[in-house]
Amino acid sequence: FEYKEADVPMAERPEIDRWILSVLNTLIKEVDTCYNEYEPTKAGRLISDFVNDNLSNWYVRLNRKRFWGGEFTQDKLSAYQTLYTCLETVAKLMAPISPFYADRLYTDLITATGRDSVVSVHLAEFPKYQEEMIDKELEVRMQMAQDVTSMVLALRRKVNIKVRQPLQCIMVPVVDEEQKAHIEAVKNLIMNEVNVKEVRFVDGAAGVLVK
């Protein structure tokens, strides 16, 4: 991937791409605030959480097939461009607190693509968040998908039921119709991730019950 093609318009990118870019812009906003308030430790934790929880364990894992071989379709191009943007931005965000690794990551990226003429991440402009890229509703929905998936997988491990063994149903407690609507919007994603045939909603219960 050399990033020679024009950017795929945001409106034409899949929801999962728009989500990670929304979270990325939220991260830029929060990390910039941390640095301005002399809170480098907090900034580092935010960057670490983004890379581990959102980028690696969720975005990359859910999109493995898009990155694999096959024709270079717009969908695949969108995935590559989105991931590249995340990595390049993370390199810039972490540069003040992890100067050597950030510089290596940034140098590797721009060497492959030639997208920047500067020779070091420390000479590049610090990222600026784009408010129009932030979709809080989408972030909330995806966070719920992550939370439910994490709990169900933890329950599977607890009772020693492997993910490849399908479950008939999980019952998810919801506190109101808004929460139910958010989870309903990502229900198929949850079902695929935990290998379950049906999601049912229950009122007032605590935790997630596996049936």
Which residues does each predicted region cover?
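Feature 926 captures the class I aminoacyl-tRNA synthetase adenylation module centered on the KMSKS loop
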Residues: 1-211
